């Protein structure tokens, strides 16, 4: 039963990623399944689900996206640990953990994008906002965060 749940969470991640790519949405929806798996089954399963998405997507569509699996792994670990410690049992904890995960994801994504893709985000909305911010005079690194 657990294995079916994990596979379902991987498909939730894959569906979110494909939906965003198809409709060119300004969102990253490839970690919903990671969060659900980490919350229900713990940090190890959350990390496995997060890594599985990026590995499978990389093998099927674009191997360059595999590096972002590190972010999904971190999301799974953070959510899983916070759920086990009870931080997600009350609103302030949920908001605090959400803020931390968002900050970590944006920071790590920026570092990985610069390290491997010269800052390109492969999302039309995100690249447009970054270009606009650079055009009006924002620092290049700050505009990507």
Region locations from a protein language model:
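Alpha-helical transmembrane segments of multipass membrane proteins
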Residues: 9-16, 49, 53, 57, ...
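Alpha-helical transmembrane segments and their immediate interhelical/interface regions
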Residues: 54-93
